């Protein structure tokens, strides 16, 4: 509102000039907000690690998994967002799930609580390791404590506008750094295309098994419960009506486009720089080697500052987004509590306690002797796939309810894709179970 007021005052002086400025700046600002937040909530260590490990260990042979996962992410998040904007009763996505069967409310509450803890576990661990390396103190656990303390200082202080601006800068820096390195590496386009349409799982040749890496990519990209955080950022932006469907879709396309560029650049770095040099990504320092080999100490700083920025921003995003998701799921179970606080999470003491849980308890994974950052990241994103079948099947049912969606219910193409997503989810979960048990 403040921006609109300022522009209105300026119009009196130079209407033609301001009109052009308003069209450009206002359109950009209002079109690309939640998508930026979504990218950083999605991105973080999951994409960074899975793409680099896949590239360094298996070249481009698993590229088709990434392509499929990004397509599924767009379609799933678009359906989730459309439900939030267009359902006839003004339900949140989790309230919609609760309408299908009470099981969904209990499942989503427990699943979101566990995954909120686990996602922040490797994000905080990674941010602590990077901060420790930057300051050369060799105390990653203490650095993780500092990260959590800094996040506490940010939360609740006009957080959306501040974080959005910071995230745009960090995302741009990270993208430019990896994109520059990927272009410099002169990627083999033929191999990229071959890997994108290959549809095969290579034999295990890396530190981490090919099937585990593939499932981890699906979990990190397509099957992430972080996809459910997007509607809460939309609400903060003021996108709450069917009239916002188009701008939401454009915003989401922009977000997915950024994801494609970043993931592809990271993958190319792994395949063209790390793999030929026999470097397997077992620690975050192994990934830093790519920039250091090409850009020297400057590249080293760019990598660690950029990665710290993304990890830190992701911790903030998850620590504010997941509590909304968790409390919303609990409101599906306990409708009286929703009515008591009029559906306003921030007024509910539970929201604060859940935020503390999601932010503080993951520190146990940063204690010396716990699994390494890379292994933890791959493991958590693989485990994330367990909830994907429930999410995909529930979404397929919910988005076809004409009583709720009217003319905005799924078209035939979306139904085919969601059905395939459900099949992929069940296959991935079964494969993961047989791998471990």
Regions found by a protein language model. Give the residues of each.
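Flexible loop linkers connecting adjacent transmembrane helices
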Residues: 10-17, 50-55, 78-101, 129-132, ...
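Juxtamembrane transmembrane-helix boundary signature
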Residues: 38, 65-98, 107-115, 119, ...
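Hydrophobic alpha-helical segments and their helix-loop junctions in multi-pass secondary transporters
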Residues: 172-203, 211-216, 220-232, 392-403, ...
């Amino acid at each position: 509102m403040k921006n609109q007021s300022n522009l209105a005052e300026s119009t009196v002086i130079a209407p033609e000039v301001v009109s052009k400025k308003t069209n450009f700046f206002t359109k950009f600002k209002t079109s690309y907000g939640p998508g930026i937040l979504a990218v950083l909530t999605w991105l973080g260590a999951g994409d960074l690690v899975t793409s680099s490990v896949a590239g360094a260990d298996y070249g481009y042979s698993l590229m088709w998994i990434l392509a499929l996962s990004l397509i599924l992410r767009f379609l799933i998040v678009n359906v989730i967002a459309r439900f939030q904007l267009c359902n006839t009763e003004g339900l949140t996505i989790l309230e919609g799930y609760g309408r299908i069967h009470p099981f969904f409310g209990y499942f989503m509450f427990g699943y979101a609580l566990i995954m909120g803890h686990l996602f922040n576990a490797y994000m905080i661990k990674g941010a602590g390791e990077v901060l420790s390396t930057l300051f050369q103190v060799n105390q990653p656990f203490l650095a993780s404590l500092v990260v959590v303390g800094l996040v506490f200082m940010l939360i609740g202080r006009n957080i959306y506008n501040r974080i959005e601006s910071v995230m745009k800068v960090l995302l741009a820096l990270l993208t430019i750094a990896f994109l520059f390195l990927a272009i410099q590496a002169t990627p083999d386009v033929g191999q990229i295309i071959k890997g994108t349409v290959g549809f095969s799982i290579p034999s295990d040749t890396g530190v981490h098994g090919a099937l585990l890496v593939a499932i981890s990519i699906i979990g990190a990209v397509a099957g992430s419960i972080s996809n459910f955080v997007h509607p809460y950022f939309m609400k903060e932006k003021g996108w709450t009506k069917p009239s916002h469907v188009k701008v939401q879709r454009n915003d989401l396309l922009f977000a997915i486009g950024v994801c494609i560029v970043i993931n592809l650049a990271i993958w190319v770095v792994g395949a063209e720089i790390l793999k030929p040099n026999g470097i397997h990504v077992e620690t975050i320092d192994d990934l830093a080697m790519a920039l250091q080999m090409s850009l020297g100490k400057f590249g080293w700083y760019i990598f660690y500052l950029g990665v710290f920025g993304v990890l830190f921003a992701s911790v903030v995003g998850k620590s504010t987004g997941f509590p909304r998701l968790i409390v919303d799921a609990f409101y599906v179970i306990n409708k009286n509590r929703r009515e008591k606080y009029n559906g306003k999470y921030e007024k509910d003491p539970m929201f604060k306690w859940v935020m503390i849980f999601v932010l503080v308890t993951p520190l146990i994974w940063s204690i010396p002797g716990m699994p390494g950052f890379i292994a933890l990241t791959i493991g958590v994103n693989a485990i994330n796939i367990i909830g994907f079948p429930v999410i995909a099947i529930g979404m397929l049912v919910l988005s076809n309810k004409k009583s709720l969606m009217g003319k905005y219910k799924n078209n035939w193409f979306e139904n085919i894709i969601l059905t395939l997503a459900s099949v992929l989810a069940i296959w991935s979960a079964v494969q993961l179970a047989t791998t471990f048990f």
